[in-house]
Amino acid sequence: SLTVQPHLRGERIADVGSGAGFPGIPLAIVEPQRHFSLIESTGKKCRFLEHVRDELQLKNVEVVQSRAENYRPEVRFDTVVARAVGPLAGLLKAAGALVVGGGRLLAMKGRYPQDELAARLNGWKVAAVHRLSVPGLDEERHLVELCRSHDRVG
């Protein structure tokens, strides 16, 4: 979960489809100066996330029970992170509106997602694809960094 840490931008981070809190909870622990919103649609998982947040006394974590496509925060996020939430096109449709102009959407993937990268991304472009090294794991992991088509890459 911490392999994405070097790629975070800004103060406001969203973890979409947070599930059991990965990568949001570990990132919030090591990045106390940033605010994390854990967005999860399942009530039972949200109650678990709230319990973990309270037990760890993470003042920088907000748990939001909502589907990403239905959530409209007052202020959009500098970085939106998603792990295991399906194809890039669907992720962009569901969570793209949560990203502030100039922000990034980081999609954690397994094998290099060649087919997904070749698909139309409707107003988005690939800023970078980072190969991730996960200690103790020999399998491929990649982080796809997306930005709006009109944003500068860099």
What are these regions (language model features)?
Residues 1-11:
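Conserved alpha-helix/loop element of class I SAM-dependent methyltransferases that forms part
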